Amino acid sequence: SQSVNQGFDYAEVAEIIQKIKKYDSFLDDEYGENALEMRNKIDEIEDLVQKEENPSRIKALLNDIKNLSIGVTGSLIASGIVTLLSRV
């Protein structure tokens, strides 16, 4: 599948998701009602990265997480997530 998805860095995405997951216990406080949506998107990304498939769906999910994080004001965790995702 390397040639099919050339140019998509699954390892980098996996690393970013691991970093985001370290803050899981803070998601409820920081994201409120969007915490569950965040977790669902993180789980779906993890699944796709593990299978190394559907990079366009992964990018869309990462963008959703970024947008959810941008909507959280005054949160160091959310702004850190936005910064992490700007690398992808």
Where are these regions (language model features)?
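Short amphipathic alpha-helical segments that predominantly mediate membrane engagement
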Residues: 1-72, 84-88
